[in-house]
Amino acid sequence: MSLKLYKTSISIFLILLIDQITKYLAIKFLSPDGIVKLLPFLNLVYVENTGTAFGMFKFLGSGFFIIIALVVTGFLVYMYFKDTQNWFIYSLIIAGALGNIIDRLIYGYVIDFIDLHLKNLHWPAFNVADSAISIGIVLFVYKNLKK
């Protein structure tokens, strides 16, 4: 196994592990109607997201999202092997997609629990997998705009 493939595999595994552990803790310790205030701008909540990012497209059902996520993940794996220089960017996005696929396969929805807000303006709840995907996309766009 090449060093980049090894680092990619370890990165994906660690991100997936952190994602699944934090979701397990959210299930175990957060109630669906409760809020845990951590900081003036950060709460922990429990949300069962049957849609996509920000809860959109709930009507399409979990099976649709699993298929789309698997296709996207397959494409990203293909891109990784074409462009191993960006291994960490692909690791973030692949791990995030897999983390949410695992939720949909096990529960039929994605578990979100991070609630960022500014006073009463709340960003939709999200999770570690969503964060990994978002950071990966931002890095991908930044790197490609720099060219």
UniProtKB/Swiss-Prot annotation:
Molecular-function GO term, any one: aspartic-type endopeptidase activity
Reaction catalysed by this enzyme: Release of signal peptides from bacterial membrane prolipoproteins. Hydrolyzes -Xaa-Yaa-Zaa-|-(S,diacylglyceryl)Cys-, in which Xaa is hydrophobic (preferably Leu), and Yaa (Ala or Ser) and Zaa (Gly or Ala) have small, neutral side chains
Mode of membrane association: Multi-pass membrane protein
Residue ranges of the TM segments: 10-30, 34-54, 59-79, 87-107, 121-141
EC number: 3.4.23.36
Function: This protein specifically catalyzes the removal of signal peptides from prolipoproteins.
Protein name: Lipoprotein signal peptidase
Protein species of origin: Thermodesulfovibrio yellowstonii (strain ATCC 51303 / DSM 11347 / YP87)
Native organism taxonomy: Bacteria, Pseudomonadati, Nitrospirota, Thermodesulfovibrionia, Thermodesulfovibrionales
